């Protein structure tokens, strides 16, 4: 398993984060088998959120590991997210604290290794967030903190009040959905890719040692589904298939390797409930695409080079 340094923590963590959004339909036995399959391949970093399957992803995960003496809490890194409620966002102090208590109860653990603010809340008071973080840290309920889907100035506003390091920012990123890369190359151009939609978040995170966690790594723009095997991205799939044959791996592995090749040292967040596909994503850790291969995939997705 390839390792990356997690923010300013200095901790070496797996490059592949096991996203648990789609695990809510598993039963206790199949969840236990899935956890073992991940951990045995070095993917012991699990990403949850309180809203995934209405909390069932966390609930079943907790049931699956707590009664298994071969799965020790200290051998897993558990991350979860809070702040999304039905029809609105809520990063109030009280709701953050309430959410964490619920997460801990469902996951059957006394602490989270990492808590992320799931999405920016227009009504969030950063001083309240700071109070919540202090309480959670001092109580031992949360060890590290990060954000998800936040722009640089939103993080800067938090950092004005929050004492703890913002360790991660979870952002959507795939070969087709890579404006934060395109924006950095189509500088001084009148092109779609030149539009700065995220405040140069890629460069900001690299400058501030914030680890980017790439979610939906196989997603097309506008949540239209997976690009692998999709005729809308025929040129991209042709190039992916060519490289998959060259490296003797699956197309999934090549698409994941494209993300891991970026020098920002991102983590890739999986979204699969399939042990086979999880293994294909983990296989990307042993593929090191060269520059020409990386750019050919980028261009095949419809991006341009000025």
Predicted regions and their residues:
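Beta/alpha (TIM)-barrel catalytic core signal, keyed to glycine-rich beta->alpha loops juxtaposed to Asp/Glu
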Residues: 120, 124-306
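N-terminal binding-site loop/beta-alpha segment at the start of enzyme catalytic domains
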Residues: 1-76, 138
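A structural motif
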Residues: 43, 109-112, 142, 166
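Structural motif corresponding to the early beta-alpha repeats
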Residues: 71-94, 118-119
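Active-site groove signature of glycoside hydrolases
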Residues: 104-125
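Acidic-and-aromatic substrate-binding clefts and catalytic sites of carbohydrate-active enzymes
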Residues: 23-29, 49-59, 85-90, 121-125, ...
């Amino acid at each position: 398993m390839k390792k990356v340094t997690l923010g300013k923590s200095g901790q070496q963590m797996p490059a592949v984060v096991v996203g648990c959004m789609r695990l809510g339909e598993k039963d206790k036995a199949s969840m236990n088998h899935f956890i073992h399959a991940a951990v045995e391949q070095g993917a012991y970093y699990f990403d949850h959120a309180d809203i995934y399957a209405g909390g069932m992803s966390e609930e079943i995960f907790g049931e699956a590991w707590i009664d298994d003496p071969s799965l020790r809490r200290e051998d897993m890194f558990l991350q979860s997210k809070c702040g999304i409620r039905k029809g609105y966002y809520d990063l109030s102090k009280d709701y953050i604290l309430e959410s964490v208590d619920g997460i801990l109860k469902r996951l059957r653990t006394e602490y989270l290794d990492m808590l992320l603010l799931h999405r920016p809340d227009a009504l969030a008071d950063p001083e309240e967030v700071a109070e919540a973080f202090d309480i959670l840290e001092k109580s031992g309920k949360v060890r590290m903190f990060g954000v998800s889907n936040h722009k640089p100035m939103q993080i800067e506003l938090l950092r004005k009040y929050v004492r703890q390091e913002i360790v991660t920012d979870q952002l959507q990123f795939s070969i087709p959905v890579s404006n934060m890369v395109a924006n950095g190359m189509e500088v001084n151009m009148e092109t779609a890719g030149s539009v700065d939609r995220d405040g140069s978040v890629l460069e900001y995170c690299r400058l501030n040692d914030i680890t980017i966690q790439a979610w939906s790594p196989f997603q097309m723009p506008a949540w239209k589904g997976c690009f692998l095997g999709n005729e809308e991205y025929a040129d991209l799939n042709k190039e992916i298939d060519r490289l998959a044959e060259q490296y003797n791996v699956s197309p999934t592995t090549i698409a994941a390797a494209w993300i891991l090749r970026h020098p920002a040292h991102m983590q890739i967040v999986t979204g699969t409930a399939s042990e086979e596909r999880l293994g294909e994503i983990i296989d990307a850790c042993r593929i090191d695409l060269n520059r020409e291969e990386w750019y050919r995939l980028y261009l095949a997705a419809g991006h341009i080079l000025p």
